[in-house]
Amino acid sequence: MITSTGNAQVKQLIQLQKKAKAREERGIFLAEGIRMLKETPKERLEKLYLSESFYEKRKNELDLAGVPMEILSDQVFRHVSDTQTPQGALYLVKRSETTLEDILKQEKTPLLMVLDNLQDPGNLGTIMRTAEGAGATGIILSKDCVDMYNPKVIRSTMGAIYRMPFVYVEDLPAVLAELKKCGIVTYAAHLEGQHFYDEEDFCEAAAFLIGNEGNGLREEVAQAAEKKIKIPMYGKVESLNAAVAASVLMYEACRQRRRDLTKK
């Protein structure tokens, strides 16, 4: 059992919690909680860390034969955990690499989220979770978006991170041009949108662009989109939260496609 916060493994866990560079260099990320553990593909589990009390009371709940395991004292576990009320399970998970080509070659009609400089971990995790629920086929992120493997993002995805393909790209306008070549219409969520979002047809291949929480889409990214659309706003509110706006757009596409299928 590990009983000291000065232990080398404990220090590595804290590095993985706090530093995107450490996660990238090792090709792994740190996840936490029982529900996420059950969602994690077993072949991607590299190592499991359980609190002493969890191990004593609930070890028989888990089918983790063959997965390396360490027990941490409850005090050390609380030191490492990123949550206010730790559940008692931390684990190292191997990262999965996806390319833009992987996302575009799927047989399903493309429904993509394109995120420009999104910074809030909760927003990103919620968008990924909603994307899976709405039937999206992938997420494309500018290189300056928040790290997908940030612990707060991981928790917010509720397991969708294991199933929703995503890729970070260096040049977002160039990628938008590539999407156009593939017949995917790109829609920028923008205050200057020519049409309301529900006036467009999203039954064919589509990609929605969502920008930074405070500043929206960068001008060069907005200009690279084929169309600008807006969500109607009443009262004195100028715009919606990024994750809420993304959800509205994705579920409108989902609604249209479901309706279209019933007509065929």
Language model segments and positions:
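N-terminal positively charged helical leader segments and presequences
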Residues: 1-84
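Active-site/ligand-binding-proximal alpha/beta "capping" segment
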Residues: 187-237
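Glycine-rich phosphate-binding loops that contact phosphosugars or nucleotide phosphates
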Residues: 91
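RNA substrate-binding interface of SAM-dependent RNA methyltransferases
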Residues: 98, 104-193
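Short, structured coil segments at secondary-structure junctions
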Residues: 44, 64-65, 157, 162, ...
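Short pre-catalytic strand/loop immediately N-terminal to key active-site residues, enriched for Gly-Thr
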Residues: 27, 115-119, 230-238
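Structured adenosyl-cofactor binding patch, chiefly the S-adenosyl-L-methionine
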Residues: 130-134, 148, 153-161, 219-264
